[in-house]
């Protein structure tokens, strides 16, 4: 759509101006400023079709990685995610060298990207533990950033018609949906005060619907249901009264949108099953250390058999599943570390007595990994680490 191409180019510039004004007016310190810039970059630059914007995002990640190294060196106390990322990096390097990754441009690029994201994830997680008002500033920034952007997403959807999935500043609708879903929960980690504060999350939910990402809606809808049922019963009743006639009125159109999406995804579903078969074949061939981090996209074709049909006609494909990716590329060693970190953070949910927002952030990260690849996203690691981060904040009364 030409309209979205226009927005992909102009919106990052407009949002940059708003971000600079926000940082200047709040007089934020360097740590919080970096976090705000990271979220700006993720929303506006990371998956934009423009290579200039993507390179700019990589520069932001690189700059923050250097700053994070300073935080890691100066910080005497070692946190859980420091140990995890170190051992996970060991598993990545082992698979890289065992499989001669230096001969693969894909493996080299993936290794560099992972190291930068690993350092960035340690840095942002450390800031979330150390900075008392980080959640307040981030929540406020996301509300201001996404209030008008959500309206634009909805308008693009209405203009384009049912069945159209909005990408906005991203190159993939699911990436946009993941950011919107995470933002909904981050915003609710701070009490909402005025009417606009309460309207923004509703706009975010509507904007998520416009992406057509059911995996995010399956988490977002229960989140709002339990949130307003617990904290604001009157608003829950009002929203229910409004929603019922809307759902009845648009049932036919919503069904049409779903059917269009299902037809488009039929081949994708079959491909995902065949990807599972490929991962199974890889695991049987290289169970301990896998085929090497970042190698699936180019190595999968060597593990096709007679039961696999669709993938024979494809030159490059990813696993669309973090668990498949870790098992195929890093083997049992990497898979053990990955699952350990997830289960360890699930344990910390018990320690913080199931904090509502943290619980849904964690569920969103873990469930999203079943359908997408997120290992090179600082947002995924931040969300997966939130139970531990929140436990540390409570422990030190931050």
Predicted ranges, named:
Residues 54-65, 80-97, 102-127:
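Aromatic-anchored transmembrane helix interface
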Residues 30-35, 77-91, 112-115, 123-154:
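Interfacial loop-to-transmembrane-helix boundary motif in multi-pass membrane proteins
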Residues 119-127, 134-162, 169-230:
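Alpha-helical transmembrane segments of multi-pass inner-membrane proteins
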Residues 194-195, 233-235, 329-365, 390-397:
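Hydrophobic transmembrane alpha-helices and their immediate junctions
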Residues 185, 359-398:
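Transmembrane alpha-helices of multi-pass inner-membrane enzymes
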Residues 1-71, 92-100:
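N-terminal signal-anchor transmembrane segment
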Residues 206, 210-211, 227-264, 280-281, ...:
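A membrane-periplasm/extracellular boundary helix in multi-pass inner-membrane enzymes
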Residues 261-285, 289-330:
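Long extracytoplasmic/lumenal interhelical loops at the membrane interface
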